[in-house]
Amino acid sequence: RNILKAGIAAKITTLGFDKKGNVAEEHRPQLMQGGALWNGQFYTEGFYYQWMSLYNRIQQKGINEVYEEAAYTWFNRLCAIRILQKNNLYSPVLQYADAARTPIIVDEARQGHLPQMKEDLRQRIVELLDDDTKVTEQFAVLLVAWCHANPILQRCFGTMEDYTELLLPANILAENGFIDLLNHTEFITDEEFRSPELIGWLY
């Protein structure tokens, strides 16, 4: 979880916030007709509202609390997905499809197999899939959609706060990053993944 928290802290910095949670006026997105302008690039309206939700949450709770909340949210969901796939309840979307550490969920999307998702996310992933170098960005959109569409995760953890979707770490797929460690951990055996205690943790 500390690995996730460090990645989330770095991601918040890239979104314009300093270590105290302050943000300069020039780093705030500007809502425009049909989208938002941020750092010289055009984004969807959804990004604007997620960014503002993050800003408001930091003002209300403080940046350290937001680090904790986002790390807790992603840790729980990613570990739960691993448990579900180890018990053959869902396809192994987090596992790698190749030596380049491309997750299966991304590989399947490149073949036209997308999880259920809202239309704005669908448009976003279609654009991203045109660029094979944007694996992490593709993974982030697909993972968010997968979490929203999965009834078990929804029942166990509820709906994610919208700002949390922005905070999946940029190094999530790096060598020795969280997904890499989750896929290759020796701390939990295959037998333990099927234990009632670990499955019970979901509930």
Predicted regions mapped to residue ranges:
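Preference for the N-terminal adenyl/adenosyl cofactor-binding alpha/beta module
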Residues: 1-203
